[in-house]
Amino acid sequence: NVDHCFQKAGFDKKRLFYTQGDYGLFQCSESCCQETFDNEAVVLEMLNRQKDMKIPTELVPVCPHCGKPLTMNLRSDDKFVEDEGWHRAAERYQNFLRTRANEKILFLELGVGYNTPVIIKYPFWQMTAKNPNATYACVNNGQAVCPPEIRHKSICINDDISNVINECINRKQCNI
């Protein structure tokens, strides 16, 4: 949910965990501090003042602590910043999983690739294997797979997400 699509669709922010980061936040490119910075106003200013695919130098954001450039808060290397908000969301997520350890649950994976499989994909597989009431579902064009151990309780749809959603909408409208 780095792009806030769940929030735009009406989901409560407190029910989301941006484990991979957030396009709406900057962080120090050197991760000198475990702090993130809202970037909407700065990004809008950049858009308004850009010319010939360039922005004015004074709009390049810098860390208020060390003066290094700020960058998007995205998990792409070992410099990813996990701020206080990230840790609060992680705790809410872990609590959600703990309180539903053996309940009926769907681990739904939409478009998760192999950039950082240890963050979402592998834990979903492990939790599905461990919970007899769990189902794993993956929609991913070209990468909808699961391990043999959970194949009997998995749904892997190897197609573009928009096609799958449109098909679901069409079936609902046709009462299928």
For every predicted segment, state its role:
Residues V2-I176:
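Conserved catalytic alpha/beta core of Sir2/sirtuin-type deacylases, generalized to analogous enzyme cores
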